[in-house]
């Protein structure tokens, strides 16, 4: 009897599993908010050089008149946001003269700071620390620092969970998220903000990895797809929730508090979660595993079945799992054989490009000239049909085709969007939304596809590699936006080209629909080579038939 059958005996998808999954989905709502938080907390309001109050008051000039006299025009014919004249051009006061000769006048960066519009935001980190003009790239850097924390968290907290358990690391991650998020809200300067956001990113990885592990290891195999989809939809709802919270909280510090304080509640009730019995057995803690299984059986109303579980029965039921645990495998096994190496290379590119393009679009909402709150809702809502389509296509068409089409179609749409004139904002927004939906479908597919491609003995290592590549994509994505300052079309070309290239690499991956999960590397190698041998045999038989027909004169007549 396997551990999956043992779970069915103790209630299957019972009251305990339903309660646990529900409680773990609440934090996922706010994980989406933290990932996309800088769309609002680091939004850039309209701004201009701050007026010298003493000068324009003493000269009987209103504020707009002062701006006209003190700032040159930019390429769009508007007062420049970053430059001012060295000397105020008082000679054009009270006239209709323009800045025709402004290029010949001496200018300098704003000396008094900046004035920011409060039409949409009361306060952001941009207005707090003047992250504009010469410091504007710090906005993208802050998001990359956060994604760097997500990467480091995946490496450190993911590894520690295999040593100290999923439950302990999940509890710690909730606490770290609450504290670091709280500290971010009270950051006195940009440097401390980046440090606390880095720690927040680490905690987010710990929550994501250990939540997934506890859900998967406590629910029966038959409902894993459903619970995984539920978690995915929770993330999507979280994107809609962020738009509502940001609309209500126009101050970035209050918004940061709003998405961080609930993690103290999650931290408190997470002590109720039991440790993964599967992990306990594989870690040699069978006695505690028996206690946890009995507790779960009791909660599911299967107390009699729980009493039948003993140390001996638990060990005998998990012989296969224990045998796999005793085998020694390392990250090197991900590239040791030709087939696994091909799978690892292709999946690494798929994960990188999906995350890279996804966050490149999702973190650039202000460029659509639409209400940032509305576009956040639209970008979040498109994930619902995308994930429904992806799930349906995976079942009826297959994983390979779904993955390939979602990447190539998304990449082509994003690439084409770079050629649409900026005046056609409705078309540009619609294409961006469609492209983001394709990438959401890709994310939904690649999680399951990766799990099915890697054998049991190196599955966690494979997922770890792919997760790392996705984090690197998330780190690089904001930095590519900086190129747009020099070549406006270039970011979309890069965001669109990456999914197309990775989509072509999917051609080299095998189909996994309706096939049992492989347990060993040898099993994967045989599964790939078997169809090739079968095709070779069919070709040989076909050639022999043709040769036989040529040698037989009756066949020639016929």
UniProtKB/Swiss-Prot annotation:
Superkingdom of origin organism: Eukaryota
Cytoplasmic topology ranges: 1-15, 162-167, 219-225, 275-342, 391-400, 450-462, 510-558
InterPro entries registered for this protein in UniProt: MFS_dom, MFS_sugar_transport-like, MFS_trans_sf, Orgcat_transp/SVOP, Sugar_transporter_CS
Post-translational modification: Glycosylated. Glycosylation is necessary for proper targeting of the transporter to the plasma membrane.
Entry keyword set: Cell membrane, Membrane, Transmembrane, Transmembrane helix
Biased composition, class Basic and acidic residues, residue ranges: 539-550
Region (Disordered): 539-558
Membrane topology: Multi-pass membrane protein
GO cellular component: basal plasma membrane; basolateral plasma membrane
Keyword set includes Membrane: yes
Localisation: Cell membrane; Basolateral cell membrane; Basal cell membrane
Signal peptide annotation: none
GO molecular function ontology, one term from the record: transmembrane transporter activity
Pfam families: Sugar_tr
Ranges facing Extracellular side: 37-140, 189-197, 247-253, 364-369, 422-428, 484-488
Spans through the membrane: 16-36, 141-161, 168-188, 198-218, 226-246, 254-274, 343-363, 370-390, 401-421, 429-449, 463-483, 489-509
Function noted in UniProt: Involved in the renal elimination of endogenous and exogenous organic anions. Mediates the sodium-independent uptake of p-aminohippurate (PAH), 2,3-dimercapto-1-propanesulfonic acid (DMPS), cidofovir, adefovir, 9-(2-phosphonylmethoxyethyl) guanine (PMEG), 9-(2-phosphonylmethoxyethyl) diaminopurine (PMEDAP), ochratoxin (OTA), acyclovir (ACV), 3'-azido-3-'deoxythymidine (AZT), cimetidine (CMD), 2,4-dichloro-phenoxyacetate (2,4-D), hippurate (HA), indoleacetate (IA), indoxyl sulfate (IS) and 3-carboxy-4-methyl-5-propyl-2-furanpropionate (CMPF) and edaravone sulfate.
Stated family: Belongs to the major facilitator (TC 2.A.1) superfamily. Organic cation transporter (TC 2.A.1.19) family.
Domain notes: Multiple cysteine residues are necessary for proper targeting to the plasma membrane.
Protein name: Solute carrier family 22 member 6-A
């Amino acid at each position: 009897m396997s551990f999956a059958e043992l779970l069915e005996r103790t209630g299957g998808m019972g009251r305990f599993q339903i309660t646990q999954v529900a409680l773990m989905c609440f934090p996922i709502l706010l994980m989406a908010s933290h990932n996309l938080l800088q769309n609002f907390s680091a939004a850039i309001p309209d701004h201009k050089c701050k007026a010298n109050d003493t000068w324009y008051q003493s000269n009987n000039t209103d504020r707009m008149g002062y701006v006209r006299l003190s700032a040159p025009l930019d390429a769009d014919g508007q007062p420049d946001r970053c430059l001012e004249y060295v000397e105020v051009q008082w000679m054009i006061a009270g006239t209709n003269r323009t800045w025709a000769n402004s290029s010949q006048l001496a200018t300098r960066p704003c000396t008094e700071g900046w004035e920011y519009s409060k039409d949409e935001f009361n306060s952001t980190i941009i207005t707090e620390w003047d992250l504009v003009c010469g410091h504007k790239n710090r906005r993208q850097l802050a998001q990359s620092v956060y994604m760097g924390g997500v990467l480091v968290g995946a490496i450190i907290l993911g590894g520690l969970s295999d040593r100290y358990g999923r439950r302990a690391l999940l509890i710690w991650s909730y606490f770290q998220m609450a504290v670091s998020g709280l500290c971010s809200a009270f950051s006195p300067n940009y440097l401390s903000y980046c440090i606390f956001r880095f720690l927040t990113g680490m905690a987010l990885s710990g929550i994501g990895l250990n939540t997934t592990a506890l859900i998967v290891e406590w629910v029966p195999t038959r409902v894993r797809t459903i619970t995984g989809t539920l978690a995915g939809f929770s993330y999507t709802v979280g994107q809609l929730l962020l738009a509502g919270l940001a609309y209500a909280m126009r101050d970035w510090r209050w918004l940061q508090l709003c998405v961080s304080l609930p993690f103290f509640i999650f931290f408190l009730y997470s002590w109720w979660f039991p440790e993964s019995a599967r992990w306990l057995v594989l870690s040699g803690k069978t006695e505690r595993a028996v206690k946890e299984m009995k507790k779960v059986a009791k909660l599911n109303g299967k107390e009699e079945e729980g009493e039948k579980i003993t140390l001996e029965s638990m060990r005998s039921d998990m012989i296969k799992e224990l045998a796999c645990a005793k085998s020694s495998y390392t990250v090197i096994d991900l590239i040791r054989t030709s087939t696994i190496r091909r799978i690892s290379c292709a999946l690494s590119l798929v994960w990188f490009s999906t995350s890279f393009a996804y966050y490149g679009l999702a973190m650039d909402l202000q460029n659509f000239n639409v209400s940032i709150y509305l576009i956040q809702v639209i970008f979040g809502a498109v994930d619902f049909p995308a994930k429904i389509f992806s799930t349906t296509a995976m079942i009826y068409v297959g994983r390979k085709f779904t993955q390939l089409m979602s990447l190539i179609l998304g990449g082509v749409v994003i690439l084409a969007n770079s050629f649409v004139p900026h005046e056609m904002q409705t078309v540009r927004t619609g294409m961006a939304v469609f492209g983001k939906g394709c990438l959401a479908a890709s994310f939904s597919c690649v999680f399951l596809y990766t799990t099915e491609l890697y054998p049991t003995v190196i599955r966690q290592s494979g997922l770890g590699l792919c997760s790392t590549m996705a984090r690197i994509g998330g780190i690089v994505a904001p930095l590519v936006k900086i190129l747009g300052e020099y070549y406006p079309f270039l970011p979309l070309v890069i965001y669109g080209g990456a999914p197309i290239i990775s989509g072509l690499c999917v051609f080299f991956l095998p189909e996994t629909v309706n096939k049992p999960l492989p347990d060993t590397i040898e099993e994967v190698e045989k599964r790939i080579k078997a169809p090739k041998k079968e095709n070779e045999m069919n070709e040989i038989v076909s050639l022999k038939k043709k040769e036989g027909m040529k040698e037989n004169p009756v066949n020639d007549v016929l």
